[in-house]
Amino acid sequence: ILYAREIAAVAMDPENRLECFVLGTNDLLKESRARALDNRFAIVPWLALTIVAARAFGLDIIDGVYNDFKDEDGFRKECEHGRTLGMDGKTLIHPSQVGPCNEVFTPTDEEVEWSRKIIDAFSQPANAHKGVITVDGKMVERLHLVMARRTAAIAHAVREIDDWF
């Protein structure tokens, strides 16, 4: 954790193939001697630090495992927590975790609809060079357009995978 930035910086080397951080939250608990509480309060600062380091160098980041694979509600809550913090997914240890994890980390219909509205609004000729516009009465900046495109891309990728099965 102390060297998260330096490790993430390796991704800038074209000879390197670092694309993603995968967190070992059990290892983090062991080494820090923190208590494994449901809200992960004790390790949130370290999770946030690794997320910031990963993002600074364009890396994805996958949250650590949830040990009680029979506790779907607890697992779902931890997935929600990870997604809220900015994680891209979660390490899984049991087939029963696949469905809930996919549900949490897949953009909702509402998120996709909002993203499409933002994309459509900025694609209008009158808005093509604006930095800030209004969509449904809300201020939206170009940074929201970047976020909307990412959400739309994830939703599209999930649909393509679903079409395979």
Over which residues does each language-model region extend?
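Expand to "…catalyze enediolate/carbanion chemistry for C-C bond making/breaking, isomerization
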Residues: 1-165
